[in-house]
Amino acid sequence: MSLNKTFNFPGAGLAWVVCKNDILRKKVVEGVGSLIPEAQLFGYIATQAALEDGEHWRLSLLSYLRGNRKLLLESIDNIPGLHMYDMEASYLGWISCKDLPHKDPFKLFLRYGVALQPGEMFNAKNHVRINIATPRSNLIEALSRINEAIGKNGIMND
């Protein structure tokens, strides 16, 4: 487990594993022991501060992300050829582009200034992944450009 993404301190470099199974725990310790450097003081202090005083901030973050998720779902629902999968406990949204007449939706959206993650990275052809953990103004701009890309490429005119 790690608080690094939730509290936006990825450089803190502190994570932990909770494992009741002694055999599995030993394998985990052996496996990651040489891969992960020792935690630094900053990581401990940042994590302690987040655990002791970060609940209000975390709840505000979750509320903000819910608003971004709602905006994303409603917007994609109104763009022909795109479909959203349910987002469960994540700030990453999967958009199906199967109904678009384009071989590579990633490149289509990139031409309009929206850099999404191509589904091929995850063995999901004709899909893209979008990160909603961003200022709402960025998400609004990205959705506007996605809508423009679809409209200018004949999808909305069919």
Per-range role (PLM):
Residues 107-117, 122-158:
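PLP-dependent enzyme catalytic core of the Aspartate aminotransferase-like
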Residues 79:
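Acidic-histidine catalytic/liganding microenvironments
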Residues 12-13, 89-91, 126-128:
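Short amphipathic alpha-helical segments
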Residues 32, 69, 143:
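Short amphipathic alpha-helical/adjacent loop interface patches that line ligand
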Residues 48, 63-73, 83-96:
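Conserved glycine-rich beta-strand-loop-beta hairpin in the small C-terminal domain of fold type I
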Residues 1-63:
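Conserved core segment of the aminotransferase class I/II
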Residues 21-22, 98-100, 135-137:
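Helix N-cap motif at beta-to-alpha junctions
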Residues 18, 94-96, 131-133:
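Short hydrophobic/aromatic beta-strand micro-patches
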